[in-house]
């Protein structure tokens, strides 16, 4: 028998054996797909309207999601502003597929999802150009101190002499000949490397999962260990997904391995950096300056936390990924992945299933019934409302978004809500970072 067919049948048994199949019948019986942490479904609706009912929840936690969605939704779209732990996932009774709009998925317990029969997908191509551009902006800002010079001008400090210029612009440095160290050479890491070379950086990288030879094709130098990269870099930029192996990758110990006066940039995941250790290093001058787009606790505030008094620090609110074009592109791809899931089978029909291996390991085959299962994803709970975009109100009634669905229910105005990027962790050309440092 074809080994690929056997493998697909095994995955079908996992998904269909743990949870019932999705019913995709004629109106009004259509599967329910819910946008968990947003309200704007105007991009997703044209792609899904003929196969599903699309609801929005605008929730920041599962406690804010109505029971109707928890009990009937078979598909979920989500950004980075909500977290799904095992406890959260267990509240969904019919869920079969989760799409993270963006590449990072550390806010989802993908192993527990697999054990519950839920496939998790991401959009690994989302916002690569935007994140790389933002990373270079942060790097240039640290070297040329644009933020601090602008702030001085706003405060009325207009230098009139060379001595005053030296005082205000102190710390500005020449880029040519500096060494940029990249941790994680996936899509975004490579895009950053190519941009940095144009600014005459010498670019080195550390990525234990990258195939040999990529460095030669890109004209980069590969470091064998993380310590070697830290010791040779004048500026370090992180492009790693967050997992149990690299949490607080930048900590007191690794900071002491860096060059004195090194710069640090993080546009990947906040948990990669121990902010307490970073704050102390900035105060001591061991790290000359840092630029963070992501933080351990978000939304970030300068008024609290270990970084509140740290000098030479630039912070932006997890927006390095954003452009209108990138947002639309990611949302379209997420909706198409949901559509593929409805057509089935799961997970073979999916392009970017990040917990496929966990799905395969979720069930002991010796104890499973060997009867054939339906190969298509035609099933889970049906939704009694007709296809369209609905918002589930506090009373549990569906409400249409104006201009999308004809309805006698009160209209809820749509508010734009956009996705978050990140990086993937699969050990293949599509993954964004080393999963084990």
UniProtKB/Swiss-Prot annotation:
UniProt-listed InterPro entries: CtBP (IPR043322), CTBP_dehydrogenase (IPR051638), D-isomer_2_OHA_DH_cat_dom (IPR006139), D-isomer_DH_CS (IPR029753), D-isomer_DH_CS1 (IPR029752), D-isomer_DH_NAD-bd (IPR006140), NAD(P)-bd_dom_sf (IPR036291)
Bias (Basic and acidic residues): 427-437
Pfam families hit by this protein: 2-Hacid_dh, 2-Hacid_dh_C
Assigned keywords, A-Z: Nucleus, Oxidoreductase, Repressor, Transcription, Transcription regulation, Wnt signaling pathway
Any Gene Ontology CC annotation: nucleus
Origin: domain of life: Eukaryota
Active site residues per record: 269, 298, 318 (proton donor)
Residues engaged in binding NAD(+): 103, 183-188, 207, 240-246, 267-269, 293, 318-321
This protein's record includes keyword RNA-binding: no
Any one Gene Ontology BP term: white fat cell differentiation
Region (Disordered): 410-437
A GO term, aspect molecular function: transcription coregulator binding
Bias type Polar residues, positions: 415-426
Primary location group: nucleus
PROSITE patterns per UniProt: D_2_HYDROXYACID_DH_1, D_2_HYDROXYACID_DH_3
Compartment(s) where it occurs, according to its Swiss-Prot or TrEMBL record: Nucleus
Function as written in the Swiss-Prot or TrEMBL entry: Corepressor targeting diverse transcription regulators.
Family designation: Belongs to the D-isomer specific 2-hydroxyacid dehydrogenase family.
Annotated PANTHER family: C-TERMINAL BINDING PROTEIN-LIKE, C-TERMINAL-BINDING PROTEIN
Subunit structure: Interacts with the C-terminus of tcf7l1-a via the consensus motifs P-X-[DNS]-L-[STVA].
Protein's UniProt name: C-terminal-binding protein 2
Organism: Xenopus laevis (African clawed frog)
């Amino acid at each position: 028998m074809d080994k690929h067919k056997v493998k697909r049948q095994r995955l079908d048994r996992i998904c269909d054996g743990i949870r019932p199949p999705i019913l995709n019948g004629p109106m009004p019986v259509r599967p329910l797909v819910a946008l968990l942490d947003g309200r704007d479904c105007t991009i997703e609706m044209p792609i899904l309207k003929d196969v599903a009912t699309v609801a929005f929840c605008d929730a920041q936690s599962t406690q804010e999601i109505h029971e109707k969605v928890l009990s009937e939704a078979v598909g979920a779209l989500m950004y980075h502003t909500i977290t799904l732990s095992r406890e959260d996932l267990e509240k969904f009774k019919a869920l079969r597929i989760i799409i993270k709009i963006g590449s990072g998925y550390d806010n989802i317990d993908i192993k527990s999802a697999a054990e519950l029969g839920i496939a998790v997908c991401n959009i690994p191509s989302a916002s690569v150009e935007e994140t790389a551009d933002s990373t270079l902006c942060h790097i240039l800002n640290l070297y040329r101190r644009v933020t601090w010079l602008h702030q001085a001008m706003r405060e009325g400090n207009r230098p009139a002499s060379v001595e005053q210029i030296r005082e205000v612009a102190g710390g500005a440095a020449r880029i040519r000949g500096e060494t940029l160290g990249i941790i994680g050479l996936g899509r975004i890491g490579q895009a950053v490397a190519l941009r940095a070379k144009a600014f005459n950086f010498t670019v080195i990288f550390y990525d234990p999962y990258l195939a040999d030879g990529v460095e030669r094709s890109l004209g980069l130098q590969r470091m064998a260990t993380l310590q070697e990269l830290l010791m040779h870099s004048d500026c370090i930029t992180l492009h790693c997904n967050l997992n149990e192996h690299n949490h607080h990758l930048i900590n007191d110990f690794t900071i002491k391995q860096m060059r004195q006066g090194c710069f640090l940039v993080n546009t990947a995941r906040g948990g990669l950096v121990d902010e307490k250790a970073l704050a102390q290093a900035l105060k001591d001058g061991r790290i000359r300056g840092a630029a963070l787009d992501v933080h351990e606790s978000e939304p970030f505030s300068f008024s609290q936390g270990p970084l509140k008094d740290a000098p030479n620090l630039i912070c932006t609110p997890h927006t390095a990924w954003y452009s209108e074009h990138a947002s639309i592109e990611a949302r379209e791809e997420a909706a198409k992945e949901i559509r593929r899931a409805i057509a089935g089978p799961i997970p073979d029909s999916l392009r970017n299933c990040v917990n496929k291996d966990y799905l395969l390991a979720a069930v002991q085959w010796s104890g499973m019934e060997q009867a054939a299962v339906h190969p298509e994803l035609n099933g889970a709970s049906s939704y009694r409302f007709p296809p369209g975009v609905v918002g589930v109100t506090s009373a549990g009634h569906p409400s249409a978004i104006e201009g999308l669905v004809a309805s006698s229910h009160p209209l809820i105005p749509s508010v734009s809500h956009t996705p978050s990027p990140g990086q993937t962790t699969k050990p293949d050309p599509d993954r964004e970072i080393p999963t084990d440092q």
